[in-house]
């Protein structure tokens, strides 16, 4: 078995920044695409119902917070983050392939559930590694 090497502080910061960015990407990549998304999911031009895609994403994030904390305590940070990122990828792929509004909303909910693992594990890993002024 290969010996585990210590991660440099730069690698840890880059990793935490990446998983933090993935949470924002789920929202920021969607907002400018609303006009293009509407016809793809069967909504009329100018329909405000498309904004539910953001609302449902946040609902998924909120629901996931309740689940991932105990899962991380029981199974560990890395397996929980891997599970969450797999769910994130599933939701993002479903959102990309959605051809009706209901499927888009379901995919966005799944995407939000996955994103909540990234959000929660980002803070949890930070707290595990650093204390006090080192966290800033």
Task: Set out the residue ranges of the language-model regions.
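Residue-level signature of mid-helix packing/kink "hotspots" within the transmembrane helices
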Residues: 28, 57-66, 116
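Helical-face signature of the major facilitator-like transporter fold
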Residues: 16, 20, 24, 92, ...
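Small-residue-rich segments within alpha-helical transmembrane domains of MFS-like 12-TM solute carriers
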Residues: 24, 28, 96, 112-120
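Extracellular/periplasmic helix-loop-helix junction of adjacent transmembrane segments
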Residues: 33-62
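Extracytoplasmic
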Residues: 11-43, 68
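Conserved MFS/SLC helix-loop-helix module at the cytosolic interface between two early adjacent transmembrane helices
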Residues: 62-102
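Helix-breaking motifs and short loop linkers at transmembrane-helix boundaries and internal kinks
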Residues: 42, 76, 97-103, 114, ...
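Cytoplasmic helix-loop-helix junction between adjacent transmembrane helices
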Residues: 109-136
């Amino acid at each position: 078995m290969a010996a585990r090497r210590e991660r440099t502080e730069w690698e840890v910061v880059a990793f935490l920044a990446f998983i933090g960015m993935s949470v924002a990407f789920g929202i920021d990549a969607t907002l400018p695409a609303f006009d293009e998304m509407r016809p793809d999911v069967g909504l009329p031009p100018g329909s405000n119902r498309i904004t539910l895609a953001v609302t449902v994403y946040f609902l998924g994030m909120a629901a996931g917070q309740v689940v991932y904390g105990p899962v991380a305590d029981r199974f560990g940070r890395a397996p929980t983050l891997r599970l969450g990122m797999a769910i994130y990828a599933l939701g993002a792929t479903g959102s990309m392939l959605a051809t009706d509004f209901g499927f888009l909303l379901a995919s966005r909910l799944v995407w939000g559930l996955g994103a909540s693992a990234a959000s929660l594990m980002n803070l949890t890993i930070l707290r595990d590694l650093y204390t006090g002024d080192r966290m800033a």
